[in-house]
Amino acid sequence: MAHKKGQGSTQNNRDSIGRRLGVKKFGGEFVRAGNIIIRQRGTATHAGSNVGLGKDHTIFALIDGFVKFERKDKNRKKVSVYPAA
């Protein structure tokens, strides 16, 4: 005999909140040192020139400059920051 009567639909109605991941500064945008460029899980995009990689794989600017997305090789992306000339 069931101990709970017909309440399966209410038990299954939960969802986790979004983690606010993704690109925060896009290509060509000006960034200041310390600005977050990408929040990600794992290194989907790798760190290029003048950017740092946080322990949670967040990519952030180390200098003031412009964001540039590039290809590292055939199937890897990287992001760099180049100073304003």
UniProtKB/Swiss-Prot annotation:
This is Large ribosomal subunit protein bL27. InterPro entries: Ribosomal_bL27, Ribosomal_bL27_CS. It comes from Campylobacter curvus (strain 525.92). GO terms for molecular function: structural constituent of ribosome. PROSITE patterns: RIBOSOMAL_L27. GO terms for biological process: translation. One of its GO terms (cellular component) is cytosolic large ribosomal subunit. SUPFAM superfamilies: Ribosomal L27 protein-like. Keywords: Ribonucleoprotein, Ribosomal protein. The keyword Ribonucleoprotein applies. It comes from the Bacteria. NCBIfam families: L27.
